[in-house]
Design a protein with these regions (language model features):
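N-terminal core-entry segment
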Residues: 1-193
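A conserved active-site cap/scaffold subdomain adjacent to cofactor or substrate pockets
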Residues: 185-215
């Protein structure tokens, strides 16, 4: 109902869906990072009373985690039918939300493994209302994962990088790199592969043809 406050999980769902609905969101890693990260971060920051600086730090953390996950797979998730925003977003947003919540390393690991089980979104749903909801679900999944981890819920040791974890399961040809993420904090995707901002509210792959037509 209008004027009534909702939970952080619901806020992330609604705002993430709305952010992706117009197709005017930023682009990187064959996905739309801010569409997932910002709704999750704003919802959690408001819930926990985090400062603007801490929210920005959470964004950078989430972006770096997203870049790290993306770098592990050389083949296209789209070609396999996966929507990268939906399948990578929950883990990146969970890392950001766990930072804002102040979870320790053990609880953060649980939250990330839970997020690996919350992923999903297929290309077959492109062109429908389900596609923007992929982003909303990814954002809300982060809050849900952090809530469960904080409450003592359990999950596998490594739901993301294990031989039977998410990255291996998603990999189109089983060629994913599952080595430890030793580059986090020393290699910065936010500077080497920064966000790209759209000129037009359509899929980014259409921008060059649009420019050619307009020229």
């Amino acid at each position: 109902d209008a004027g009534q406050r909702r939970s952080a999980t619901a806020a992330a769902l609604v705002n993430g869906t709305a952010a992706h609905a117009l197709d005017f969101d930023d682009v990187q890693f064959n996905a739309h990072p801010s569409t997932v990260l910002v709704p999750a971060i704003l919802a959690e920051a408001e819930r926990s009373g985090a400062s603007g600086l801490k929210a920005l730090q959470a964004y950078v953390l989430g972006y770096e985690v997203w870049g790290e996950l993306h770098s592990r797979e050389k083949n296209s998730y789209h070609d396999k039918g996966w929507h990268p925003t939906a399948v990578m977003g929950p883990m990146a947003a969970t890392a950001a939300a766990a930072f804002l919540r102040g979870l320790d390393a053990g609880a953060t690991r649980v939250a990330l493994s839970l997020a690996a089980s919350f992923t999903g979104g297929v290309v077959a749903n492109f062109g429908s209302m389900a596609k923007p909801m992929h982003a909303g679900r990814a954002a809300s999944s982060a809050i849900h994962a952090v809530n469960l981890a904080e409450a003592g819920f359990t999950a596998g040791e490594d739901g993301i990088g294990a031989p039977d974890g998410l990255l291996a399961a998603l990999s189109p040809h089983g060629s994913v790199n599952r080595d430890a993420a030793t580059g986090l904090g020393s290699r910065w995707f936010s500077t080497t592969t920064p966000l790209i901002f759209k000129k037009y509210p359509v899929c980014f792959s259409s921008h060059r043809p649009i420019d050619a037509i307009l020229d």
